[in-house]
């Protein structure tokens, strides 16, 4: 088997995790207590879902995941929630006091005490796997636990499981909506280690997902549950090819190979065109239509405009009633569009996956039941907008050394701030250079080598 272990760190990671496992269980016909009634087996005896679930002797299916948090409150909700019987108690690891939005507490003082417990939990899961392909890490970089403990854990995973790929689903601070004053600090400090210790990071941001909920799903006042369910749909589409059999299946390492041209350029934009139940009642969208809308700025899950940048590569994951012929036609149309620009050194740029399992919807959820859907992750130079926004906010605060004493008091050194900030400045520069036309600069290149 090619198993994948999911790691949910901090409040955002855990709540997105809840939405994901709720959806995965529905997709595979697994009940909240982990039982899978034999008559409900979708796809007739397809066991590909074992990449995400392990089966116990009593026929119970347990998610291959751990939930980690420094404070007890969020994990207690899982312990008492609908899916409490799904998880083994050892998979839910929580501490006594939280990181208080402080990267240094999550990474140094408090995180250090709990990280070995976490790694033991992960080791137990890894030992049950026959061919572990890698890890999915869910966290946000604005808070203290997701950023601090999240990056500490990634660093330790690199040491313990060097060759295994690590995919991050990372919630970045939004341009307008903020949940903490020190978000820019936490984000810059933790992106510093995301650069080093993840192979692919998919960027999500709440504001962009809010807008999708409001605009496409007509939800006037979206809650976090609405947001997380939408994010779960994207993650489900990306991982569907690991959990179901399909025509063009995509492995975790395949994402890496096709999307990452240079090791540092691995921050992805994701997009998922969704429509509300009311709209779907009147129209079924064709493959060409959903493909076009995947490239619309309005479908992007992070606040940045892909028209301001160039695409290096993109991965289109279709599910449901889709055949390769339609996909090829849709992609050919995209290539002729002037608004969608690719860098000139990457002429093909498309990787497609097709999965015959149509999207499942959560009962009483907001999404329509549709025949076919697409989800795209793309590597675009436009993502640099996200970094420059955070860097700018970081600079404003750091110029006055505002709030820095909280970090230094937890054992950080001021030098780490400037080191992380310089690393991000270099990253912005990298993105700029990748997007520059190569044809013009050929003469200069030789001088530089």
UniProtKB/Swiss-Prot annotation:
Coiled-coil region(s): none
Subunit structure: Dimer of alpha and beta chains. A typical microtubule is a hollow water-filled tube with an outer diameter of 25 nm and an inner diameter of 15 nM. Alpha-beta heterodimers associate head-to-tail to form protofilaments running lengthwise along the microtubule wall with the beta-tubulin subunit facing the microtubule plus end conferring a structural polarity. Microtubules usually have 13 protofilaments but different protofilament numbers can be found in some organisms and specialized cells.
Cell compartments where the protein resides: Cytoplasm, Cytoskeleton
GO molecular function: GTP binding; hydrolase activity; structural constituent of cytoskeleton
InterPro entries linked to this entry: Alpha_tubulin, Tub_FtsZ_C, Tubulin, Tubulin/FtsZ-like_C, Tubulin/FtsZ_2-layer-sand-dom, Tubulin/FtsZ_GTPase_sf, Tubulin_C, Tubulin_CS
GO cellular component, one term: cytoplasm
Reaction equations catalysed: GTP + H2O = GDP + phosphate + H(+)
Residues that bear N6-acetyllysine: 40
Protein name: Tubulin alpha-2 chain
Entries under Pfam families matching the protein: Tubulin, Tubulin_C
SUPFAM superfamilies in the record: Tubulin C-terminal domain-like, Tubulin nucleotide-binding domain-like
Residues that, per the record, bind GTP: 11, 140, 144-145, 179, 206, 228
GO terms classed as biological process: microtubule-based process
Function, as annotated: Tubulin is the major constituent of microtubules, a cylinder consisting of laterally associated linear protofilaments composed of alpha- and beta-tubulin heterodimers. Microtubules grow by the addition of GTP-tubulin dimers to the microtubule end, where a stabilizing cap forms. Below the cap, tubulin dimers are in GDP-bound state, owing to GTPase activity of alpha-tubulin.
Family according to the record: Belongs to the tubulin family.
EC number: 3.6.5.-
Main location: cytoplasm
Residues annotated as catalytic: 254
Keywords linked to the UniProt accession: Acetylation, Cytoplasm, Cytoskeleton, GTP-binding, Hydrolase, Microtubule, Nucleotide-binding
PTM description: Acetylation of alpha chains at Lys-40 stabilizes microtubules and affects affinity and processivity of microtubule motors. This modification has a role in multiple cellular functions, ranging from cell motility, cell cycle progression or cell differentiation to intracellular trafficking and signaling.
């Amino acid at each position: 088997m090619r198993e994948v272990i999911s790691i949910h760190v901090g409040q955002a990671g855990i709540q997105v995790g809840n939405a994901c496992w709720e959806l995965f269980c529905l997709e595979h016909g697994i009940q909240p207590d982990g039982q899978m009634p034999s008559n409900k087996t979708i796809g007739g005896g397809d066991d590909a879902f074992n990449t995400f679930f392990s089966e116990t002797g009593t026929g119970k299916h347990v998610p291959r995941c751990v939930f980690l948090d420094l404070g007890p409150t969020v994990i207690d909700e899982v312990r008492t929630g609908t899916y409490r019987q799904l998880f083994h108690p050892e998979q839910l690891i929580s501490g006594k006091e939280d990181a208080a939005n402080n990267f240094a507490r999550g990474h140094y003082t408090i995180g250090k005490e709990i990280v070995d417990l976490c790694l033991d939990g992960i080791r137990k899961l890894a030992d049950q796997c026959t061919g572990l392909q890698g890890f999915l890490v869910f966290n946000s970089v604005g808070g203290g636990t997701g950023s601090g403990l999240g990056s500490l854990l990634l660093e330790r995973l690199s040491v313990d499981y060097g060759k295994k790929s690590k995919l991050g689903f990372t919630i970045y601070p939004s341009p307008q909506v903020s949940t903490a004053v020190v978000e820019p600090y936490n984000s810059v400090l933790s992106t510093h280690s995301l650069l080093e210790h993840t192979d692919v990071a998919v960027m999500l941001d709440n504001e962009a997902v809010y807008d999708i909920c409001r605009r496409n799903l007509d939800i006037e006042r979206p809650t976090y549950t609405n947001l997380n369910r939408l994010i779960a749909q994207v993650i489900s589409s990306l991982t569907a090819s690991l959990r179901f059999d399909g025509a063009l299946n995509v492995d975790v390492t395949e994402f890496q190979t096709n999307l990452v041209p240079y090791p540092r350029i691995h921050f992805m934009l994701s997009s998922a065109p969704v429509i509300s139940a009311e709209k779907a009642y009147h129209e079924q969208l064709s493959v060409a239509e959903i493909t076009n809308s995947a490239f619309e700025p309005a479908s992007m899950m992070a606040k940045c405009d892909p028209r301001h940048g160039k695409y290096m590569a993109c991965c289109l994951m279709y599910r449901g009633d889709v055949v390769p012929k339609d996909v090829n036609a849709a992609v050919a149309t995209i290539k002729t569009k002037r608004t969608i620009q690719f860098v000139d050194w990457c002429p093909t740029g498309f990787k497609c996956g097709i999965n015959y399992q149509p999207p499942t919807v959560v009962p009483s959820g907001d999404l329509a039941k549709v025949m076919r859907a697409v989800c795209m992750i793309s590597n675009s130079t436009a993502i640099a907008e996200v970094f420059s926004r955070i860097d700018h906010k970081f600079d404003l605060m750091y110029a006055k050394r505002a709030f820095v004493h909280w970090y230094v008091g937890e054992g950080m050194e001021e030098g780490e701030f400037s080191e992380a900030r310089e690393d991000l400045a270099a990253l912005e520069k990298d993105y700029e250079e990748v997007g520059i036309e190569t044809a013009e600069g050929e003469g200069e290149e030789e001088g530089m080598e």
